Amino acid sequence: MEEEKMSDCIFCKIINKEIPGKIVYEDDECMAFLDLSQATYGHTLVIPKKHYANILEVDDETLAHVMKIVKNLANQIVEKLDAKGVNVLTNTNEVAGQTVHHFHIHILPRYDENELKIEFTDHSNDVDLDEVYKKIKNKKRCENIFLKERKLFK
């Protein structure tokens, strides 16, 4: 089933050069290309070449590499396209807006504050932060992740 999904994946087809893409960066592990929608001028996607459905599945080493490329490309986009800033984001699952199920990160150059709306609704009066904190805090796991990250970024 997973193999079938990958054969239908538009990003895998771009990686395999089965369909064209405006590729702005490529190495052994990842690729970056212009998003056809161009939500903003220069809208770029960065993807790992290995198929992962979303950020929850990607291994830490691949994620670290992809993020380094995102940072470098975002800087290049700001400089070369005279963007005033960028949004860097990923969507995970349909409820969050994911439409292509191959992990990817959007680099959205920003020129004018009105060209794209990304808004956060304030629910602070409806949420018990202590309750949420207790549910997601895991000190031991965070310590292990920190040690692993220190090794990754050396």
What kind of region is each of these model predictions?
Residues 1-154:
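HIT superfamily nucleotide-processing domains
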